[in-house]
A protein has these predicted regions:
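Extracellular and organelle-lumenal recognition/adhesion modules and their flexible linkers in secreted
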Residues: 14-159
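Bacterial N-terminal signal peptides
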Residues: 2-12
Length: 159
C-alpha cells in the first residue's frame, strides 16, 4: 500500500514541473564570453589573450604542477590591460594534500580603461606544504574586455 502511495506522489509531483527558461546554445555568442588570440594588442611576444565578457566571469588561464615551493612565497604575476566596467584580478588555487586553498589579488586590480600593468597575487607555503598543482585564474567582476600577457610564476623565501 505504501509503495502505491509513493509511486502516485512521485508521478504527480513531476507533472507540476515548469520550465522557466531555455538557453539555446546554437551560437557561441550566447555564452556572453569570448576568448581569442590578439596579435595587435600585446605586451610582449607575438600576441596576447583577449577576453571579452558581458557579465562577471572567472577564466582559468592554466594549471601548473611539479613546483618546488615548500617554505616559500609563490607569486603569480601577469601583464594585464583593460577596457572594463568593473574590475579584474588574478586568483590562484593551490591544491595541497587533498585540500584546495586560494589567494585572490583583490588589492592589485585593473579597472576601467588601463594600459598594460603588472598585477599579482601571492601564496605562502609553510614548511611541509607542497602543492600538487596550482590553478591560475583571472576573475572579471563586471563586463568589458581584458587582455592578458606574460604570465610568470616566481618564488621568494619566506621572511
Amino acid at each position: 500500500m505504501l509503495l502505491i502511495l509513493f509511486l502516485l506522489i512521485a508521478l504527480t509531483s513531476s507533472a507540476y514541473s515548469e520550465d522557466l527558461k531555455k538557453l539555446k546554445l546554437d551560437d557561441a555568442s550566447a555564452i556572453g564570453t569570448t576568448i581569442q588570440t590578439d596579435i595587435h594588442v600585446k605586451a610582449e611576444g607575438k600576441a596576447s589573450i583577449k577576453i571579452t565578457t558581458l557579465w562577471p566571469t572567472t577564466i582559468c588561464l592554466g594549471e601548473v604542477s611539479g613546483l618546488d615551493v615548500e617554505n616559500a612565497k609563490l607569486l603569480y604575476k601577469a601583464k594585464v590591460k583593460s577596457d572594463l566596467d568593473g574590475t579584474a584580478f588574478l586568483e590562484m588555487w593551490a591544491h595541497v594534500g587533498g585540500g584546495q586553498y586560494f589567494s585572490k589579488g583583490m588589492n592589485d586590480v585593473v579597472s576601467q580603461k588601463t594600459d598594460w600593468k603588472i598585477i599579482q597575487t601571492p601564496f605562502l607555503f609553510q614548511k611541509g606544504q607542497r602543492p600538487d598543482k596550482v590553478t591560475l585564474n583571472l576573475v572579471i567582476n563586471g563586463k568589458g574586455t581584458v587582455w592578458v600577457d606574460d604570465i610568470v610564476l616566481s618564488k621568494e623565501p619566506l621572511k
